[in-house]
Amino acid sequence: MSVEQASASGAVSDIVEDDKSHLIKGGAFLATVATAGMIAGFGATLAVAKKKSPDWFNKGIIGSAAVPESGASLALRALGWGSLYAWCGVGLLSLTIWKAMGVHSLQEFRQKMQSIFPAIPKNEDAQANSVPFDWNSIFKSK
């Protein structure tokens, strides 16, 4: 093996390492942003509920003799189970599609999806020639 081939194979392995590192960092970033969004949305919802009716909000925090479980703990339990069902459902759906298509890597999946669905035009000329969408036609009364 010559020096040029050795340096070329070293450069290729460096590129692969950089791609893996970039993919991991991107996944961590997306997970962080999604988690922050969920926490912010849940917190904002609680803040609005407390602002609208503080008496009812405080009654829901503490359990009573009539209702042994507080509304807040019931809501948190429902949020937990709903999140679990959503994660498992999306994972199962993704796995089913993956296996049904018979692909073995993300590259194969991408190629298969590109062969099934039409390409999305990236240039502005194609968008300029298309008919603009009219929202008023949808909401117009008959």
UniProtKB/Swiss-Prot annotation:
It holds the Pfam family DUF1358. It is a multi-pass membrane protein. The keyword Transcription regulation does not apply. Residues 1-27, 99-142 are mitochondrial matrix. It is found in: Mitochondrion inner membrane. Belongs to the TMEM242 family. This is Transmembrane protein 242.
